[in-house]
């Protein structure tokens, strides 16, 4: 009897099994994923509100007689503060959740901009144009929300403390070095075709942006994770890898913004938003999976559902940006009959318009119809003076004297 009682006591004192510890680790990983996802959603939502506030400030100043500059208004400064707050939230989210989860959540900013643009900015629409124009946008918002839910639910649960040793080990690993070699070769080829061959296709430019952006998010996660550990008491700022990652983060972000600016000068913003989101998200998830090993240990079902969430979010963003209004470009128009004393350049009195092929130049004037002939610049006819010699120097134009009628 005593032997059986002692055996029961020993069984009660056994440590918890590995299955219970695995369940607790999975629960902790899901909580960290949820914290990171909420921070990212909050950050993107606040950034969208900030951008629309600043847009509202510019619209209000343009439509009023207020002589103040935009940076002297409280609305613009409130938008700037909210933008910094949102970017800080997105930056902090990388320290809690895997990179593969945070990157696709930028679809939240597209959803918020579509809704705020209609409500806050009061973008007007006619009832007859509602079905044609806005139904697809609302369907896109719904698909993007469904995709975001799938991303959060089936996101990878790989969590690793971003210590200096771990970041250095990932940086010199063979898979990432091979990935870096392929990315550098591809980036150089795209840059060559873009600069030397004038390959101004939007996919070429946004691929350059996406390749730089993948390095930006990899370095952002390392910097954010090391900063959070330092705040918690485990100082990581004395590792040189922290400063290497910080410099790479700033440099890639600056060049990424430069290429985005060039793309915005040639293509519509809605097209840039949809194509850029798809390319940047795909390449960034690939970089995160190689550098941080996000999908190691994940089962096939979770990976497939995560990929399905990405595809649904891609489709939602495409539908949202597909029907945005395209701005009408400014086309300068010159009517030669409006100039007093100037005869029409053409016999039938047709108006002429500047040639707008490469630059805003008035070097040649082109007829309005489809004639391909380009006329020379207009000049005033040279008139010889009646009372002077032909070789006399002076103004080669005849002066017309006007007298007032009493």
Curated annotation (Swiss-Prot):
Name assigned to this protein: NIPA-like protein 3
Glycosylated position list: 166
Main location (coarse class): membrane
Chain positions found as Phosphoserine: 372
Keywords, alphabetical: Glycoprotein, Membrane, Phosphoprotein, Transmembrane, Transmembrane helix
GO biological process: one example: magnesium ion transport
Name of the gene: NIPAL3
GO molecular function annotation: magnesium ion transmembrane transporter activity
InterPro entries per the UniProt record, alphabetical: Mg_trans_NIPA (IPR008521)
Membrane-topology annotation of the record: Multi-pass membrane protein
Alphabetized Pfam families for the sequence: Mg_trans_NIPA
Organism: Homo sapiens
GO cellular-component term (any): membrane
Annotated localization: Membrane
């Amino acid at each position: 009897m005593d032997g059986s009682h002692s055996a029961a006591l020993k069984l009660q004192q056994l440590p918890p099994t590995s299955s219970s510890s695995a369940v607790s680790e999975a629960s902790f990983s899901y909580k960290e994923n949820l914290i990171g996802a909420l921070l990212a959603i909050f950050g993107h939502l606040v950034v969208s509100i900030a951008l629309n506030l600043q847009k509202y400030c510019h619209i209000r100043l343009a439509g009023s007689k207020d002589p103040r500059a935009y940076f002297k208004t409280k609305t613009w400064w409130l938008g700037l503060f909210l933008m910094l707050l949102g970017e800080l939230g997105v930056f902090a989210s990388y320290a809690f959740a895997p990179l593969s989860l945070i990157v696709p959540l930028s679809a939240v900013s597209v959803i918020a901009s579509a809704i705020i643009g209609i409500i806050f900015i009061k973008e007007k629409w006619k009832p007859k144009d509602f079905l044609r124009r806005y139904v697809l946008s609302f369907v896109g918002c719904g698909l993007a929300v469904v995709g975001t839910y799938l991303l959060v639910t089936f996101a990878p649960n790989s969590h690793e403390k971003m210590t200096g040793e771990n970041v250095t080990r990932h940086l010199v690993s063979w898979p990432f070095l091979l990935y870096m070699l392929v990315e550098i070769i591809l980036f150089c080829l795209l840059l060559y075709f873009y600069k030397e061959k004038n390959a101004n296709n939007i996919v070429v430019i946004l691929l350059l942006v996406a390749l730089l952006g993948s390095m930006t998010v990899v370095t952002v996660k390392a910097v954010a994770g090391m900063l959070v550990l330092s705040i918690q008491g485990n100082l990581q700022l004395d590792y040189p890898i922290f400063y290497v990652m910080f410099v790479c983060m700033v440099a890639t972000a600056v060049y990424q913004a430069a290429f985005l600016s060039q793309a915005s000068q040639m293509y519509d913003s809605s097209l840039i938003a949809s194509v850029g989101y798809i390319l940047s998200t795909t390449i960034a998830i690939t970089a995160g999976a190689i550098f941080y090993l996000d999908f190691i240990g994940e089962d096939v079902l979770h990976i497939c559902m995560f990929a399905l969430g990405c595809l649904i979010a891609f489709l939602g963003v495409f539908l949202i940006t597909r029907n945005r209004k395209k701005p009408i470009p400014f086309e300068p128009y010159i009517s030669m009959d409006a100039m007093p004393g100037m005869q029409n350049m053409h016999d039938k009195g047709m108006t002429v318009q500047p040639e707008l092929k490469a630059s805003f130049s008035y070097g040649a004037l082109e007829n309005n119809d489809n004639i391909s002939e380009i006329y020379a610049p207009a000049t005033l006819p040279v008139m010889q003076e009646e009372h002077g010699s032909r070789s006399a120097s002076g103004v080669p134009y005849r002066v017309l004297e006007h007298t007032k009628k009493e």
